[in-house]
Regions:
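Helical (often loop-to-helix) elements that flank the catalytic cores of nucleotide-handling enzymes
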Residues: 86-105, 126-153, 173-193
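Residue microenvironments linked to proteolytic maturation
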Residues: 154, 158, 164, 174
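DNA replication initiation on ssDNA origins
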Residues: 1-75, 80-89, 163, 169-178, ...
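Residue-level "edge-of-site" marker
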Residues: 2-4, 116, 159
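Alpha-helical context
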Residues: 54-58, 122, 143
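Conserved short beta-strand edge segments in small beta-sheet-based binding/regulatory domains
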Residues: 42-47, 147-159
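Histidine-centered divalent-metal-coordination microenvironment in nucleic-acid enzymes
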Residues: 75-78, 103, 109-137, 162-172
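Catalytic micro-motifs at enzyme active sites that drive phosphoryl/nucleotidyl and oxygen chemistry
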Residues: 60-68, 99-115, 152-157
Length: 193
């Protein structure tokens, strides 16, 4: 598991790091520690090749969380922004209403919805990890469906194999605030594809 941190140090300046964990509990502990220090914590949506973890353990600290090192995925994830100037919904209720409309109009299962502090992340959790090629195909097709249905999503997030997203139970410290990252709706559970 890869945990990514982003510490805001001033106007448009930040320090980023990545941490590798061998278990969910170890990853959670890293995230809790970062959050207690008012540092934004994210998790990588991909599982990475074994060699990546071995390099990290040997002290290689360069950015190993890159798309070419990603191999398996357990979620299809999408980002809906709120309150930004463009490609965004004005308010959270409007974003959630539009998401519900698109899901219902297309007979999709309701996704897990996470309030990120500045929008929502939606996740279709998979019952078992899938390989990158299958993930890219599924994520891309669902992205096209969302866009064609009029849902305003960040088009890059959904097929970015090196993407990191905020961790539920931590906080969004962007812009000097402390907004909880929380589950808004649990959705219809995990899915098989």
């Amino acid at each position: 598991y890869c945990i990514f941190s982003l510490q805001h140090t001033g106007e448009k300046k930040s320090i980023s790091n990545q941490y590798w964990a061998s278990s969910i509990s170890e990853a959670a502990k890293i995230a809790e520690d970062l959050d207690s220090k008012r540092i934004d914590a994210y998790y990588a949506i991909a599982d990475y090749k074994k060699e990546v973890y071995e390099k990290y353990k040997k002290g290689e600290r360069k950015n190993l969380r890159i798309a070419e090192n990603a191999c398996r995925f357990s979620t299809l994830s999408y980002d809906i922004d709120v309150g930004k100037v463009k490609n965004s919904y004005a308010e959270l209720p409007e974003a959630l209403k539009e998401l519900r409309r698109v899901v219902e109009d297309n007979d999709l299962p309701m996704p897990l919805i996470v309030g990120s502090g500045s929008g929502v992340h939606i996740h279709y959790c998979l019952e078992a990890p899938i390989e990158k090629e299958q993930w890219l195909s599924l994520a891309g097709r669902l992205k096209v469906l969302f866009i064609n249905a009029g849902l305003v999503i960040d088009p890059v997030v959904s097929t970015d194999a090196s993407r990191v997203l905020r961790i539920v139970g931590t906080h969004n410290y962007k812009k000097g605030g402390k907004v909880p990252v929380r589950i808004i709706a649990e959705g219809d559970g995990s899915h098989t594809y």
